Amino acid sequence: MSGDAFNMSVAYQPSGMAVPEWLNKGDNAWQMISATLVGMQSVPGLVILYGSIVKKKWAVNSAFMALYAFAAVWLCWVTWGYNMSFGHKLLPFWGKARPALGQSFLLAQAVLPQTTQFYKGGGGADAVVETPWVNPLYPMATMVYFQCVFAAITLILLAGSLLGRMNIKAWMLFVPLWLTFSYTVGAFSLWGGGFLFHWGVMDYSGGYVIHLSSGVAGFTAAYWVGPRSTKDRERFPPNNVLLMLTGAGILWMGWAGFNGGDPYSANIDSSLAVLNTNICAATSLLVWTCLDVIFFKKPSVIGAVQGMITGLVCITPGAGLVQGWAAIVMGILSGSIPWFTMMVVHKRSRLLQQVDDTLGVFHTHAVAGFLGGATTGLFAEPVLCSLFLPVTNSRGAFYPGRGGGLQFVRQVAGALFIICWNVVVTSLVCLAVRAVVPLRMPEEELAIGDDAVHGEEAYALWGDGEKYDSTKHGWYSDNNDTHHNNNKAAPSGVTQNV
């Protein structure tokens, strides 16, 4: 056998053009895997979840809204969005728009140029560096990919508030506008080296940038778009609960990349973040389910999914910053407080009743995201903070030492900025889109659904996803196919057909 057969591929040699000295193959591989996991949360995860959790006549439209947003964000991101979020500073809350497409840019070592932290708050000659800029050991192409899927899922989560009535043409315009004028501001301010980043506001993986933003913006957009049809608001059953669980499962497992990739390295903090994520999600799901059983006498599968999501959202701002016991506490809170706002406060609030938030994104993402940010300000452990944050000696208020109480104030102030910005900008975007096309579908399309909007239907089945109505069709027995047209209680052995 020739000795050449044993030659190592250039990709695995210690040096060479494809493997520069600064490249860490483990970090690069983990970052691309994390990005792909987050991408799979959207496609197919949320595509499946949205397509199955809605009424049958809206399955195609709901899934397509997610698919379109994922594709549209990609093009906007590499054309101008990435550098507005992670490039050089234009304003304290915004980066300069420029493409992220050139070979020299994408193959260079990744760096977030505005993330250098100075003790005296500036970059002058007398300034002393507190923490150097973020400079991961992989190419910029990996960073652009990783951050893009986060931007995409934010728009898709926002869409959950608008399912079942938003004009698809209006959605096509809304996505690039909202990405440009809202998402990039939150991302730069908190992650890219903006004023909240340097002030020390903690958002480990997007509790504010993604979840609080999408929840508030979704609720605001739902106000401007208007409600679903009266019939749909009264009855909106999921068309396939098992597919809904499939999408939810992809979402849960994909969160390993969502939170595990944010240290920008395959390090010990990444491992802790993944573990805490699962602890909090499991705790929240169980608490939500227990509350359903206590107050409604039955465990709701949809409720379990909502509890899972609120747990995942709540841990996101502090996934790698809190200890395991704190993740359990956050899970208890995220399984109970959003449950209370959705099941109790929502029914008593005129504003919440007026705004038709289809999937309750305000509760599952805005409330849970704010809760996660606030509790991170309480439970962030000092040693863990030193592994990730630019401001040294950061800590939550629960831990003694200088700055703990101030950290909680920072967290609340950061949340208020994100809330106010999204209310104002989302309203302006909706008004701008409304000047071009109607935000809401016409009543004729609302009555028909997918076939009117897309000329396609998800299932060639009878009915609209609702259960068999015994008051109209009588009882059907497994032992007797005779239908009894009466309103008496179902006898033993009787089932309600779907």
Swiss-Prot record:
| The UniProt record lists the keyword Transmembrane | yes
Q: Where in the cell is it found?
A: Membrane
Which Gene Ontology BP annotations are present? ammonium transmembrane transport
InterPro entries per the record? Ammonium/urea_transptr, Ammonium_transpt, Ammonium_transpt_CS, NH4_transpt_AmtB-like_dom
Compositional bias segments (type: Polar residues): 487-498
GO CC terms of this entry: plasma membrane
Domain of life, source organism: Eukaryota
**Region spans: Disordered:** 478-498
Keywords of this entry: Ammonia transport, Membrane, Transmembrane, Transmembrane helix, Transport
What GO annotations for molecular function exist for this entry?
ammonium channel activity
Keyword Membrane set for record: yes
Check the record and name the SUPFAM superfamilies matching this protein.
Ammonium transporter (SSF111352)
- PANTHER family with a match to the protein in the record: AMMONIUM TRANSPORTER MEP2
User: Belongs to which family?
Assistant: Belongs to the ammonia transporter channel (TC 1.A.11.2) family.
Describe the task this protein carries out: Involved in ammonium transport.
Under what name is this protein listed?
A: Ammonium transporter 3 member 1
What is the species of this protein?
A: Oryza sativa subsp. japonica (Rice)
Recall the taxonomic lineage recorded for the source organism.
Eukaryota, Viridiplantae, Streptophyta, Embryophyta, Tracheophyta
Question: Which gene codes for it?
Answer: AMT3-1
